[in-house]
């Protein structure tokens, strides 16, 4: 929704991980076949299944939800190959919006990325998550791990963030904003609702450009 897609457009998108026939076709995995390709063809998938809005192509990968599937299953192999193809074999800017948590790091799904932006809130558990993400990311060879503090309400929150996050890692803060909440309730992009939030995010983007040079 933040990109400008309508709810109807988003509801019509089927995540790649849910496209069972596609996964079986590319990996040659079936319920009766425990052996499958570890290097399925994926280079055509972004063009075939991506949706474009405002100059941004959105590809919904989905998650692997099979119980006890472990780290290696046909769906996971497929998703990891798609990400690797986008990151390593194309001259595009790729932004991965990952679910909160550490699972994607444990599976190595984000290996090959140049830059991590960890979105936290003013709280001890959120700060600890950032520390864990940074440690695991460095284990994957990713040393650019930075923080955006979200839903910052007041000076106490600001002081907490500045105390807990090293200045060189902090990209900026996005303050709690009722206009952004209203936009979310209406299923609209906050871009058209709050110039303050847009200004804060632009400042973060400019800092990313500087730290990623």
Give residue ranges: language-model regions.
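N-terminal phosphate/diphosphate-binding loop that engages ATP/GTP or pyrophosphate donors
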Residues: 1-54
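Switch I (G2) and immediately adjacent beta-strands of P-loop GTPase domains
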Residues: 42-62, 84-89
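Inter-motif core of Ras-like GTPase G domains
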Residues: 81-90, 104-124
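Anionic-ligand binding region
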Residues: 98, 112-116, 127-133
């Amino acid at each position: 929704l933040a990109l400008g897609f309508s709810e109807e457009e988003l509801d019509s998108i089927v995540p790649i991980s849910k496209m069972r026939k596609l996964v079986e076709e590319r990996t040659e995995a079936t319920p009766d076949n425990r052996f499958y390709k570890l290097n399925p063809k994926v280079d055509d998938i972004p063009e075939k299944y991506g949706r474009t809005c405002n100059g941004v192509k959105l590809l919904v990968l989905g998650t692997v939800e099979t119980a006890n599937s472990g780290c290696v299953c046909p769906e996971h192999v497929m998703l990891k190959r798609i990400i690797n193809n986008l990151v390593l074999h194309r001259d595009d800017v790729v932004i991965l919006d990952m679910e909160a948590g550490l699972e994607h790091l444990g599976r190595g799904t984000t290996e090959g990325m140049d830059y991590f932006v960890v979105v936290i809130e003013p709280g001890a558990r959120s700060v600890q998550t950032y520390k864990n993400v940074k440690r695991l990311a460095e284990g994957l060879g990713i040393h650019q791990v930075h923080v955006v503090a979200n839903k910052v309400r007041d000076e106490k929150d600001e002081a907490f963030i500045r105390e807990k996050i090293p200045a060189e890692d902090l990209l900026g803060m996005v303050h709690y904003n009722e206009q952004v909440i209203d936009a979310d309730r209406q299923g609209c992009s906050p871009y058209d609702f709050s110039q303050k939030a847009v200004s804060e995010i632009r400042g973060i983007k400019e800092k990313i450009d500087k730290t990623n040079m």
